[in-house]
Amino acid sequence: MDQFIKQDETGDLIETGMNVANHFLSTPIQGTNSLSKASILPGVAPVLIGNPEQKNIQHPTASHQGSKTKGRGSGVRSIIVSPSEAGNGGTQIPEPLFAQTGQGGIVTTVYQDPTIQPTGSYRSVELAKIGKERMINRFVEKPRTSTPVTEFKRGGGRERLLKARQSKRRA
């Protein structure tokens, strides 16, 4: 059974995602301080701790315990921010999806949440709008025509082949 997302639901989902992205883009990054326990909002920690994926990672099953694996910390990589980069919170990161040729048009951006002030590249906001439109149009059903559409079937034209064989046998 196919489940379709209605157009207004898709718009709401994308709008929520855009608000989350704008929230994180609007706050300056201050080195490794943003990754501390203090950055977790009160009341969110029980949800994170109760996450079933986290429980699965912390308590592997018996079938996985016997396998040879590297040390627990081997897959963890720390991010080191140089002091010159850490002091410049809110610096603009170049957009890798667009060619940096210096040729750009005028982009008008409409923000629905007045508390979120845009920072960063307006090109990325425009790219997100294009992606939103594509996602909305992707799941919209196309109108069906009144005339039936003939579908290609494997081995099609078999009736003509059988009639030709029967006419050869009669001759």
UniProtKB/Swiss-Prot annotation:
Top-rank taxon, per record: Viruses
Residues passing through the membrane, by range: none
Compositional bias annotation for Polar residues: 54-68
Region (Disordered): 54-98, 145-171
Biased composition (Basic and acidic residues): 151-162
Coiled coil: none
Family the UniProt entry places it in: Belongs to the Orthorubulavirus I protein family.
Protein name in UniProt: I
Native species: Mumps virus genotype A (strain Jeryl-Lynn)
